[in-house]
């Protein structure tokens, strides 16, 4: 990974993702898109530095940057943030190993991060790249978020 790149980033317009090249593209695309998804390797110093430059409260940044194994989301006035439990993306592993995905979601920016590869991120990324994700709400199967319907 280069010094100025997330693991990957997409800008979404009309429900379709367009891959972004680096942090500068992610920062610059804000007003021209519906939302931006940036996925970080939180073990990288560059990713941590980019995360700390976000205009979010310090406690939000510290929570998502921390290497913790907590499965909990918090709702603030203009964002949802925290950690989701997931499984490591290790195709040759005999057993499933737990992992943690950090999340910060606002209306225009979704930031996810991990220290190890995770299955759900790999699956969503492959669907975005294949243009198969439909522009509809994603069901939260973790039992943490649920709709009122």
Say what each PLM segment does:
Residues 1-149:
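Peripheral, non-transmembrane regulatory/ligand-interaction domains of membrane transport proteins
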């Amino acid at each position: 990974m280069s010094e100025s790149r997330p693991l990957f980033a997409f800008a979404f317009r009309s429900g379709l993702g367009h891959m972004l090249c680096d942090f500068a593209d992610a920062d610059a695309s804000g007003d021209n898109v519906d939302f931006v998804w940036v996925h970080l390797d939180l073990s990288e110093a560059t990713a941590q530095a980019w995360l700390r430059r976000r205009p979010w409260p310090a406690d939000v940044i510290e929570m998502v940057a921390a290497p913790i194994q907590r499965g909990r989301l918090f709702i603030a006035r203009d964002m949802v943030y925290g950690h989701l439990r997931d499984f490591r993306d290790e195709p040759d592993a005999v057993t499933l190993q737990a992992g943690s995905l950090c999340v910060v979601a606002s209306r225009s920016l979704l930031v996810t991060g991990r220290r190890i590869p995770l299955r759900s991120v790999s699956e969503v990324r492959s669907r975005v790249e294949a243009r198969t994700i439909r522009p509809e709400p994603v069901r939260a199967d973790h039992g943490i978020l649920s709709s009122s319907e």
